[in-house]
């Protein structure tokens, strides 16, 4: 995080105590509304905001921490930033520090320097090889609520430290199941947008964008050939440029989600027979949303989406892809679900009778009482 993105505020008194600290605003509304709705004494800590305390007690504690805490492989400015947050958290004195940003470097740095607190993270995206290769800091979870058993295997193989894996599925998918449980199918295909305002051959993202653009061009060709009922799940990146891009390459009769409406992409998936994409988290989440998932792989390896071949189409020519999609659409959903039942615990382990939000809520209450 760059200092220029941080806003500074000033305060005379030390922060109030709270039992639960939500670290960072990302996903905090979901946590408060759906996971912690019956829990009191919650504070949301905004990592883009620093409160400067003109308080002698705070200042002395901060200086003591600077002298006593050693953080390796970290710039001086980041070290001071982490120690300052640690000092503030010591005054807040939470039992639980929870985040919906499971690969946040500040969260993991704090987990090593703050003792006698329970650190809980909720997985909010796929953690495939091309993502893991870019993470240079140490991962350390007390509890990780992950998508499935497959995540546990990947974490172990990558030497990510997780004391307690809780494979409960996707929290947002669980919320969507509650919110949209009576939807009927309206679309043949939902294409998941992974749009980023980047140019081709951008090495900064391991050429992921190049593959996604190619997948989009392939699907555009297929959509012009066939009269499918289509909806595009927009991600909202790039503002109006994302919609402009799709409208420039797709037929006029295509529907689009509204990124400004909560969980609208999840609604679109639940209304679609087949969900198609490259390496979006939504593609895996569709397994819990009564849709049939298909990755179109143009990368010739599994570094972007390492799952069973049942969910992957190795692209060679458009006729083969067309045949694969038609086969998927023709299968009754109950038959499809039965054919993938052994993969559900591994990839998206949602129990519709005990959704992720309920499991996390119950576990948090148990920790608070312990």
Label the model's feature ranges.
Residues 29-33, 78-83, 206-221, 357-361:
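Well-ordered, non-membrane alpha-helical segments in soluble/globular domains
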Residues 52-59, 129-135, 154-157, 175-180, ...:
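Short, charged, surface-exposed secondary-structure boundary motifs
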Residues 47-50, 101-102, 124-125, 170, ...:
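Short loop/turn segments at strand-loop or loop-helix junctions that form parts
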Residues 173-246:
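Conserved catalytic-core segment of nucleotide-activated headgroup transferases in glycan assembly
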Residues 2-13, 18-36, 40-175:
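Active-site and donor-binding regions of nucleotide-sugar-utilizing enzymes
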């Amino acid at each position: 995080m760059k200092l220029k993105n941080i806003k500074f505020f000033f305060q005379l008194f030390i922060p109030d105590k709270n039992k639960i600290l939500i670290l960072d605003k990302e996903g905090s509304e979901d946590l408060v509304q759906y996971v912690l709705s019956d829990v009191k004494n919650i504070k949301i800590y905004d990592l883009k905001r620093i409160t400067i305390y003109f308080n002698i007690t705070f200042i002395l504690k901060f200086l003591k921490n600077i002298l006593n805490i050693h953080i390796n492989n970290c710039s001086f400015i980041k070290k001071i930033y982490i120690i300052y947050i640690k000092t503030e958290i010591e005054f807040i004195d939470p039992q639980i520090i929870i985040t919906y940003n499971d690969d946040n470097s500040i969260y993991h740095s704090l987990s090593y320097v703050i003792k006698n607190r329970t650190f809980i993270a909720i997985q909010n995206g796929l953690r495939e090889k091309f993502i893991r290769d870019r993470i240079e800091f140490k991962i350390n979870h007390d509890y990780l609520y992950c998508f499935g058993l497959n995540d546990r295997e990947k974490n172990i193989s990558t030497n990510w430290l997780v004391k307690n894996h809780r494979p409960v599925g996707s929290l947002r998918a669980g919320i969507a199941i509650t919110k949209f449980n009576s939807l009927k199918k309206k679309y043949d295909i939902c294409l998941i947008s992974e749009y980023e305002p980047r140019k081709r051959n951008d090495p900064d993202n391991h050429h992921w964008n190049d593959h996604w653009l190619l997948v989009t061009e392939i699907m555009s060709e297929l959509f012009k050939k066939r009269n499918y009922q289509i909806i595009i799940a927009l991600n909202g990146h790039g503002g109006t440029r994302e919609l402009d891009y799709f409208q420039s390459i797709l037929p006029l009769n295509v529907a689009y989600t509204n990124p400004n409406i909560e969980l609208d992409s999840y609604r679109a998936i639940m209304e679609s027979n087949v969900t198609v994409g490259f390496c979006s988290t939504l593609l895996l989440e569709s397994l819990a949303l009564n849709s049939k998932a298909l990755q179109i792989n143009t990368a010739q390896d599994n570094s972007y989406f390492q799952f069973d071949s049942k969910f992957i189409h190795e692209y060679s020519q458009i006729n083969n892809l067309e045949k694969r999609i038609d086969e998927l659409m023709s299968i009754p959903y109950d038959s499809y679900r039965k054919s993938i039942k052994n993969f559900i615990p591994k990839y998206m382990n949602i129990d519709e009778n005990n959704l992720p939000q309920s499991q996390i809520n119950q576990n948090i209450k148990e920790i608070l009482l312990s």
